[in-house]
Amino acid sequence: METAAKTNKRDIQDGPPKEVKLPISEALLDYHCQIKENALEQFMARIKKLREKNQKYHERNKRLKDEQIWHIRNLLKELSEEKSEGSVVVTREEVENAMKEKWKFERDQEQNLKDMRIQISNAEKLFLEKLSEKEYWEEYKNVGSEQHGKLITSLQNDINRVKENAEKMSEQYKITLEDARKRIIRETLLQLDQKKEWATENALRFIDKGSYREIWENDWLKKEIANHRKEVEELENAIHELEEENLVLIDQLFNCRLVDLKIPRRLYLTQAVGQEVPPEVPLELSETHKVIPEKSDSQPVDIKSRDVSSISFGSSGFRLSHKDSRFGQLLKIDEEASSSIEFGASDMKYLLYEDEQDFKDYVNLGPLEVKLMTVESKKMPIHFQEKETPVKFYEDVRSPESHITYKMMKSFL
C-alpha cells in the first residue's frame, strides 16, 4: 500500500512537462529528497524482512518451548517413577538444605566472578599504565635520550674541567705553601744565627782576659790537632808505600843471582874501590854485639862493607825522596833503634845499586883466597830539623786573626 502511494506521488510529481526547468536550489532539494526517499524505502524493506524473521523465530521458540516442557514432564515422570521404586524419601528440611547449599554455591560463584572481574579490571588498568609507561619511554628513547645524553656529556666535561682546575690550584697552593715554609725556616734560621752572633758579641764584651785567651788557645789547639791528624795520615800513607817498596826489593834480592858475594874483600878494596889493604883483624861476633848496644839514640852506625860512599849516597837519596822533614827524622830514629836491620838494608841497597863497570878486571885476576867480611861501627852525630812553633803572647790577641767568632764559641757548647 505504501509503495503504491509513493509510486502515485512520483507519477504526480513527474506529471509536469519536462520542458519546465527548475532553479538549481530546488533541483538540489529534489535530488536530496529522492536520495532520502530511496534510503527510506530500503530501510522499510529491511525492517519488513526483519519483522518476518522475528515472527518466524518467535514461532520456532514457542514450538521448542512446548517440546522442552513436554520432555521435562516426561523426564520428571520417569524420575518420579524411579524414585518411587527404589529411592529414599527426601524430607523438606533436606530439600531446603540442598537449596541453601546450592544458593550459597551460586553466591560464591557470583562473588568469584565479581572478584575475577575486579582482578581483570585491575590488570587492564595496570596494563594500560604499563602501556602508557612503555610509550613514554619509547618516546624518551627516540627524542629525550639524545638531549639528556648531550646534557650528561656536557656536565661530565664540566666536572672534569672543575677537577683539573682544582688539582692545579691545589698543586699551586702546595708549591706556594712549601716555598713559604722554606722561606720562613730560612729567615728564622738566619735570625737565630744573627741573634746568636749578637748574643756572643754581647757576651764577649763581658768576658775577662783569661777566659778570652783560653778560648783563643782552644781554637788554636783544634787547628793544630787537625794539621797533626793530616800529617799523621800522610805519614801512614808514606810508610805503607815504603813497606810495599821494601817487600818488592826483598823479593828482587832473593830472586836475583848475587855473583859478587864470591869476590874476596882484598880484591874488592884494591881493584874496585882503590883503597889500601887494611891489616887483617879477626872477626869476633862478641865485639860486634858489644858495639851495637853501646850506641846511643843520637849516634847512628856507619857500615863499611863494600862501598861506604855508595851506601851513604843510596841512603841519603832514599831519605831525600820524602818531602816531609819530620818523616826523615823518624827514619833516622828508626835507624838508630835497629842498627842490625839498617846494616842489612844498606847492604841490600848496595847490592841492588852496584855498578858492574867496576868489575872489568875481575875476569883476569885468577883464583884468589876467599876472605870473610868485617863490620865496623863509627859514632856520628844526628842533626834534627827543628820546627819553629809560633809563640804568641797575650798582646797578639788583639790582632784580627785572633778574634773570637760565633763558630769558635759554638764549638765549646
Swiss-Prot record:
PANTHER family: COILED-COIL DOMAIN-CONTAINING PROTEIN 83 (PTHR21468:SF1), HSD9 (PTHR21468). The lineage of its organism: Eukaryota, Metazoa, Chordata, Craniata, Vertebrata. The keyword Coiled coil applies. It comes from the Eukaryota. It comes from Bos taurus (Bovine). This is Coiled-coil domain-containing protein 83. The gene is CCDC83. InterPro entries: CCDC83. Keywords: Coiled coil. Residues 32-186, 215-255 form a coiled coil.
